[in-house]
Amino acid sequence: MAAALVSVSASAQQKVFFYSPNPGGGLRMAVLENDAWNDLGRLCSSDYGTWGAEKKMIHPSLCRANDGTWRLVFQLNDRSPLFGASFSRDLVTWRPQDYPRVSGPKCLNPVVVPAGNAFHVYYQTADGATRRIGADTEFRHFIGDEAVKADAKMWQRDTVNIKGEQMIGQIFSITDAELQHVRDDFRLQGEKWAPTNERMHDDTQKLSIPSVVNATLTVSPNQEKTISDKLIGIFFEDISYAADGGLYAELVQNRDFEYTSKDHRGWNATTAWHSSKPIEIATEHPLHPNNPHYALIWPDTLWNEGWDGIVVEKGKKYIFSMFVLAGGQKQNFLIQLVGQNGQVLAQSKLKTHASDWQQFSTVLKAKASDEKGRLVIIPQKAAHVGIDMVSLFPQETFMGRKNGLRKDLAQVIADLHPKFVRFPGGCMSHGQGLENIYHWNHTVGPLESRKPDFNIWNYHQTRGLGFFEYFQFCEDIGAEPLPVLAAGVPCQNSANNAEGIGGQQGGIPMADMPAYVEEICNLIEWANGDPATNEWAKMRAEAGHPKPFNLKYLGLGNEDIISTVFEERYEMICKAVRERYPDIKICGTVGPFHSPSADYTEGWDFTKKHPNLQYMVDEHY
């Protein structure tokens, strides 16, 4: 395509103007017609960082290479040490943006200029100095960052009037053919999106149907198609309390006292817990390093509100358990389920005696029902006692599994007869920033040793519904597990970290990628390995499943922007998995939006260039 652009360079030229009307307006294009500038539409927009606070394109700067292709840079905000960079062959299709990092704390007013077959990006610092970074021909890799002196003319812009408003940008000349190509694309996109602008007000006219409709139906039985027996599956995403408070049968909220403001604004270790006196939280002698907070209680009533209340059903049994730290003292507790009006729905005594953390349990049988019950814990003796991992499960879970799933919800899923189950996300898989990438190995083992985390959807993950429970559920309903893990990058909508870096945050540092690749390979060993020879497989066996789960599929990446940072890490992971486990079928991704998005185009282009990396890809709509 580049050669074609050069070959028509001698044809008639048209003046066009590139500009951004406001930080959220993206890069737009106008054309000079009859001595007036007319806006054609938006060419691309920023995909950096969180929705609302970010996604801004400030001071866009373009240059055209000798081969007719285009390079674009822009400022992201006034606080990040990054700039946006993209590439286009025809002004219509733009490659997914990269966000190179600069040496200082801020990157202001970047401009791009050709430098032979490569490019230079100049930018200004907060103190007014000028620095320069080099970029390769493909505009994918950026090296060096040095202080330079630059002519102020480099930042000069053109000013034009568009419908009475003064706009600042750059004027270029392109050929008639190039301009028509852009016009055609805007027309096609307008036609494609026109149905989304339909209004119910127009339905009476548009949907008018005559009283009699004649139609002919032709059946061609010889043209039947074979339908895949694995076509229909389900996608479990931990969003809107789908796990804790949802499919996972645990009835106690914040059972681990690990809620923090990272989970949700205003939350803390005592959220969902109540007492007549302030609840004391300690960390000096934790149940497990991954679960450092616990409650210290005196003989005062402590109660938990559950998930918008605890649904208690008459005649049903509930298993209560908690870990107790009493320093060798005997301590008895009265455990109750209490209704909205104060009625005791069920109760049982719990006797404890332990010198260190020890788990105790009892069974409660409900004598009445209430949809808004609560769990009450009453110490029977004056003593300072530590408690943690306070749990209440219905005795009846799906398939009777310990630490299992809600019987009603799980049965609905089972009745769909899905052939596969995608888990655990979604945006939760790649997480809110690098620190929040979902690590499967944090979700297996004893519950108290699992590592909780905040959820990108603004709540908490106990990890009680972890990979063991997920694989067990797939086996119970006859579905293939399709676990989805991050491809070395977090969600592109991640907020800025302490350094002001958001979005994909540069991905997991390449120096740390071998360890991350090993983590993914360990999942395959955990699922399919021999407990006699592999430690991860031994962990699976100790959890109650000595036979392999027979994992066949592995998802890598979740609707990521197909940036250079993503492609490099995705390829690294795929090559390692394919080399060590050739029978595992990898499911890749082609971005967050369907055609004609930049990520969809780049994702499919990358997939076709690397056909041996993956067995299939996920198109996100």
Where are the regions a protein language model picked out?
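Extracellular and organelle-lumenal recognition/adhesion modules and their flexible linkers in secreted
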Residues: 196-462, 480-482, 497-511, 581-585
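Noncatalytic carbohydrate-binding groove/subsite architecture in carbohydrate-active enzymes
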Residues: 366, 373-381, 530, 540, ...
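Aromatic- and acidic-residue-enriched segments that line the glycan-binding/catalytic groove
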Residues: 431-447, 491-539, 543, 603
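Alpha-helical scaffolding within the catalytic cores
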Residues: 54-58, 107-109, 212-219, 277-283, ...
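Structural recognition of the beta-strand scaffold that forms the well-ordered cores
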Residues: 61-63, 71-74, 111, 120-123, ...
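Bacterial Sec-dependent N-terminal signal peptides
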Residues: 1-13
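Carbohydrate-active catalytic/glycan-binding domains of CAZyme proteins
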Residues: 11-208
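Active-site groove signature of glycoside hydrolases
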Residues: 379-380, 394, 424-427, 487-492, ...
